[in-house]
Amino acid sequence: MIFKEEGPLLDKIDRIVDRYVTVIGGNPFLPQFLIGEINRDPEKFVRILQNSGIDPNFLQRVIDKEVEAGNINPIQAADLIPNLIGMIIMPFAARPLFQTIFFQGDREKYDEYLNKRRKMVSAFIKQALTRNPA
């Protein structure tokens, strides 16, 4: 898991976005499948997450350490992860709609958009984590 790798949290954001976009881009129906399976058997996915070593408490400790060092604004892991994953997954899950309304159905242009979006999502999350809240 990327969050357990060495280095600053802000650097990990780039790697997370890149990895998720790459995986989902190669498996475009994965978001719909996972959402369906999570709704069908949520306990199964809790077990899978627990067995895979994903530990929300560890992530919160990483976040808290970065906050204490003055590197990021305070945030809960329960807010960061859904924000990050939602920004990554939604353009894939809603592709038929977004490709039609924003790109007149042009698949190549939408693929370009998805690829460029990697940097935008990383920058957006990093800015939210480091910008002084109003």
Regions found by a protein language model. Name each.
Residues 1-32, 69, 77-84:
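Hydrophobic alpha-helical connector segments
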Residues 4-7, 39, 43, 68, ...:
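Short, flexible helix-adjacent loops and helix caps
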Residues 8-12, 47, 72, 109:
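A structural signal for alpha-helical segments
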Residues 20, 34-37, 84, 88, ...:
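Short alpha-helical scaffolding segments that buttress acidic/His motifs in well-ordered protein cores
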Residues 22-64, 79, 106-112:
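Short secondary-structure transition hinges
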Residues 26, 57-69, 73, 87-134:
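C-terminal peripheral helix-coil segments that are non-catalytic and often amphipathic
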